[in-house]
Amino acid sequence: MNFNEILYGVAYYDEYMPYDRIETDFKMIRDAGMNVIRIAESTWSTWEPEEGVFDFTHLHRMLDCAAKYELNVIVGTPTYAIPSWLAKKYPDILAVTHNGKELYGHRQNMDITNPDYLHHAQIIIEKLMEQVKDYDCVIGFQLDNETKPYDTCSKYAQAKFVEYLKNEFPDIDEFNREFGLDYWSNRVDDWDAFPDIRGTINMSLDAEYKKFQRKLVTDFFAWQADIVKKYKRDDQFITHNFDFEWHDYSYGMQPEVNQYEAAKCMDIAGCDIYHPSQSSLSGREITACGNIARGIKGDNYLVLETEAAGNHPWLPYPGQLRLQAISHIANGACMVEYWHWHSIHNAIESYWKGVLSHDLRPNRLYKECSVIGNELKKYGHRLVNLKKTNKFAVIADNASLTGLNEFKLNNESDSNYNTVFRWLCDALYLMNICLLYTSPSPRD
């Protein structure tokens, strides 16, 4: 997929603002040379405060103002953080995991196989799409947000797992032999008596369940994409902000998602890349994670989230924002988008700083963003859709990752697949050797 210009912008939340300043914000965004915002993905309860009662006031304010200031918009489906009324009416929606039953409050606490969740998620996606489909400024759609299976072990998930195993192993004796289930009397001779997967001591069977959980994510994306495709125009794209294994920052391959398979229903891969800054800014995370993103579909990608200031010690030194933006673009990104425009005034991410601080006034970061944005207005058409010719490829896959993590290199060490993966990537990065990461399975 090709673009005419580099997309440069921010995530924006009118619904989080302490007071009305949307005109001021969008003028500042435009004046900074930014040309895109992402909206809507986090606030299902704002769009549907009660079951069947919808209020898209903030959505239309953002879309109307974006059109006025000639900003492109990416709309996210708001299904990763469920409203309280949904959890109260259908408590089974809250996931059952290896650690027990989830409580309401934090995000991504639901069972993505639960039929009541899927029913209501489809309703809010369709209602949202009906609201945005006629806006020319909407250029694309982000499916959900940093999706994973959330370790769902619900009755629905486990029933699906048994059906998955029956399809993979029509002969139950073959299944028992393949996984060595005579050990400790773990043998299963009746599919209807299949034990709760959370109790297994068989690492191979546990690895198979993790593979199945990754398939749940792939199926979830395909399901959402089919809904969105009923409304999207031919000139609009579908993407997702894939994330990475987290070591206080984006580190390596995401163990819980087969990103190669999950992205097949999308037009372009997207990702979220967060990394240390100041004296710890090395470029390694931007390169390693960007290479993973580029390998998902073997093409350019979108950085749907990266930090402007971000975590407490990450306030960038002067010039680092520009260095970071150019690094993303040089690695094949067609978009660089900050999470987020304004620092949030309450809740858990209050001090994950945006472009603007809590006083919402122009600052050093805003001025540096303005330099980047206005440079990209001049030269972005020459930098977009950059291709890299790689002499080396690294085959990286979830099956190897899961296997190595299940059967550890050293029980006294925290080293895992991604640790070894990064040793290799970082060494080659320091040697200025460009890599492509690819799946062991050929692409369609």
What are these regions (language model features)?
Residues W191-F194, A222, K230, D234, ...:
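Carbohydrate-binding surfaces of carbohydrate-active enzymes
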Residues M17-I29, S250-E261, P318-A325:
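Short, acidic/polar
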Residues T24-R30, I39-V96, A225-Y231:
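Aromatic-lined substrate-binding rim segments of carbohydrate-active enzymes
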Residues H98-I268, D272-S279, G283-E285:
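Polysaccharide-binding and catalytic clefts of secreted carbohydrate-active enzymes
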Residues Y8-M17, T43-T57, L103-H120, T147-Y150, ...:
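The substrate-binding groove and active-site-proximal loops of carbohydrate-active enzymes
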Residues N4-I6, G33-N35, A67-V73, D134-I139, ...:
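Short, well-ordered coil/turn segments that N-cap beta-strands
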Residues Y13-E15, A40-T43, G76-W85, I139-K148, ...:
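Short, solvent-exposed turn/loop segments enriched in Gly/Ser/Thr/Pro and often Arg
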